[in-house]
Regions:
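Helix-to-loop junction immediately C-terminal to a conserved catalytic motif
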Residues: 57
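The conserved cystathionine-beta-synthase
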Residues: 269-291, 295-297, 315, 327-356, ...
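ABC ATPase NBD coupling module
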Residues: 73-87, 111
Length: 394
């Protein structure tokens, strides 16, 4: 794993009280976020999660306590200087409509006085990193991009000056569910490379479980209800409030803690149009993991399933004979999302593909079910079953 380039962020009894308010918006929040981890702030409306995040870059000034980045109090720097050293991604992206994509990405380096050659090199590097080839995207304008593409530019812009800390305020909340899952997976893949310290705000507990190395659950009045890893929170909710907020299906939510890459993938019987039917029948009958062949194109991208009925007789396989719609998932897809996708498939199998949609292997509903039934170790060091109860010793 790459070395973390993030910084330790610590809240020390951080408080925000607005004039005339009966209670503080954030009440003596204390927690420490290790360098290179994603900490998700989650809770109901009015719990102070966004306020807590904005106190880090002082878009909202704290009225008590301290917030430090690698031991340095955020109040010790001028606010503008502080913000230029912290990445910031918001739900509506906030790109300048009259700037090109390259200019939007390079805003902070430009403010920091970088020369043009260095800015161009950095923007091209980041656009490539977020999956937007610079030759194709750098001279476009925001209105020429899809919502998902604009959000990728927002992430690239936040990384432009290589900040140790990134703040993300419901960054994927404004896109449709399919694009949202893709963006989540892409960001997790990116985080494995850049290892920033990320403070991520969401109201969605499922997103918190998927994205967070640690989760801070806040309740109304800005009170910290629990701060721990997703696995520990699901195994041992600290209070009735946390248990209600996480929901009754804690066992199913545990599937969000594991990803497709954590499973042993099945080996597909990959075929191309024009291959001999008899040879494919032989391969399917020779100890294959599955009863279906997977038709792929010349780039090894899935086109559909071929079953025994399609293989009757002799001669070459016709691409039109394949049953289209083989569901695809990525290695970063959570097992919960994968299960939801696979349950809509008549063959109960999903095709695992890379970022270029090339086949890596297959995942089955049965394999996900086995993972769901397996006990997990909670914060108390004991194994817990799918309902959070202490599992019997084997």
């Amino acid at each position: 794993m790459p070395e973390a380039t993030g910084a330790v962020v610590a809240f020390e009894r951080a408080t925000k009280r607005y004039p005339g308010a009966d209670a503080p918006a954030v009440n003596e929040l204390s927690l420490e976020i290790p360098a290179g981890e994603i900490c998700v702030l989650v809770g109901p409306s009015g719990c102070g999660k966004t306020t807590s995040m904005k106190m880090v870059n002082r878009l909202i000034e704290p009225t008590g306590g301290r917030i430090t980045i690698d031991g340095r109090d955020v109040m010790s720097l001028p606010a503008v200087q502080l913000r230029r050293g912290i990445g910031y991604v918001i739900q509506q992206v906030g790109l300048f409509p009259h700037f090109t994509i390259a200019d939007n990405t390079g805003v902070v380096p430009s403010l920091l006085g970088w020369d043009r050659a260095r800015i161009r090199e950095r923007t091209d590097e980041l656009l490539e990193l977020v999956g937007l080839p610079p030759a194709e995207y750098r001279d476009r304008y925001p209105t020429e991009l899809s919502g998902g593409e604009r959000q990728r530019v927002g992430v690239a812009r936040a990384l432009a000056a290589d900040p140790p800390v990134m703040l993300m305020d419901e960054p994927f909340g404004a896109v449709d569910p399919i694009r949202r899952e893709r963006l989540q997976n892409e960001f997790l893949r990116l985080q494995e490379r850049v290892r920033k310290t990320v403070i991520f705000v969401t109201h969605d507990v499922d997103e918190a479980i998927k994205m967070g190395d640690r989760i801070a659950i806040l309740q109304r009045g800005g009170i910290l209800a629990q701060y721990d890893t997703p696995a520990a929170i699901l195994a041992n909710p600290a209070s009735e409030f946390v248990e209600r907020f996480v929901g009754a299906d804690r066992g199913l939510k545990r599937l969000s803690l594991a990803r497709v890459r954590d499973l042993q993938l099945l080996e597909p019987v990959v075929v191309h149009a024009g291959e001999d039917r008899a040879e494919v029948r032989r391969r399917l009958g020779a100890g294959a993991d599955v009863a279906y062949a997977l038709l792929v194109d010349a780039e090894r991208r899935p086109l559909g399933w071929i079953d025994q009925h399609d293989l009757r007789g002799g001669g070459p396989i016709d691409a039109a004979a394949a049953t289209p719609g083989a569901p695809t998932v990525e290695p970063e897809t959570t097992l919960r999302d994968a299960l939801s996708t696979l349950l809509g498939s008549s063959v109960q199998l999903g095709v695992v593909v890379d970022e270029r949609e090339r086949v890596l292997g297959l995942v089955s509903v049965d394999a996900i079910g086995d993972r769901l039934r397996a006990p997990v170790r909670g914060a108390d060091g004991r194994l817990h079953d799918v309902d959070g109860e202490v599992a019997a010793a084997s």
